């Protein structure tokens, strides 16, 4: 590439032609650099290449495929990291959340600690699981706002509160907002009973969907008060419906299903707040795992 640049500087008459050659040389050099980085990535991660294929002017490496878990274990359990990994799937409902939400948890301890990690034991079982009613019934009569600026409400004292309500209820109610409901959506809300979803609607209420049969069962789901909810996602996009009222679930109601206390305030646009709630790990589940790790750290000290 240095030769092409020198020719470009010295040859004023053919500078345009030389410039094109310089650009091509730079492109070739970048392609080589990218290829070497890919080779380094394969080598660093012990990925076995068992064939190379030339196609469309490029060279493709065929590698053996394996799961993300195997990939992580292969790296973290060996030099230079040397972790002992424990993996399990925990359900938030077993730790006090009023929803069925499974999450894969991986905990790693340095091998030289010689300590065995044990996942936290469930504190709730079938028959004692918390429900949607436990989480949101006390704010049913508070009309949600429609804009982010409408999200502040003062909650009166509730000395009778107990269980989950007592754990989550605050003095102020933030983020209690929903989307404005259009006529078509409202007609669907009114048509659905607790536990029903989009597929239980009559054909005339499905006409705005190009492929209604492929719509997920979680769309237009009306929650059941006396059961745990399903996995909380972005309930605005899924159009989750209040168990008894013909309106969408508010951001705060979804946050309570996730076990966020009222004191936790979500910031950003309405869309962003709904997404933050849907993406989150339930604090009750996170707390259970964190406390189990703290007990390990106490042993180390």
Positions of predicted regions on the chain:
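S-adenosyl-L-methionine-dependent DNA methyltransferase catalytic core
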Residues: 1-87, 94, 99-301
